[in-house]
Amino acid sequence: MCSIMGYCDVCDDLEAFQKGFAKTISRGPDDSRIVDTGNGLLGFHRLAIMGLTASGMQPFSLGGSYVVCNGEIFGFERLRESLSDRYTFQSDSDCEVLLPLYETYGTEMFRMLDAEFACIIYDGKTQEYIAARDPIGIRPLYYGYDKKGTIVFCLLYTSPS
């Protein structure tokens, strides 16, 4: 399983985010990336299972929006095919369908997913974050608040040291 983390406001302490995010690296030791959305941070530790090439590395981006996801999207090939006239896919990753789905259907896209997942989407147009998980929480997604009251999402809860 991979690890995802999101900080949903302009971050003035990248080191603190990196320190917390580093505690989850055991879930994704193959590669790591943090992207600054301009309105917060999204982090991804990769355990390469699907989309094994570098193009399958997250966060995925599309038109100023970003997504990080830990999950398995069943039947993603069918979803890719339905979006292929509007979007050229860059990888074999099942999670790459999420942003084109979101751009096309908004949050209604989650009803279309046969999946076990936890994801965080940053919408570059509205400058909002959307966090979601599968209905029964096979892939849990925790949230909390920092000292400033900013919401933080993480796939794996780790207690402060």
Feature names for model-found ranges:
Residues 1-159:
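Cysteine-centered catalytic environments shared across enzyme families
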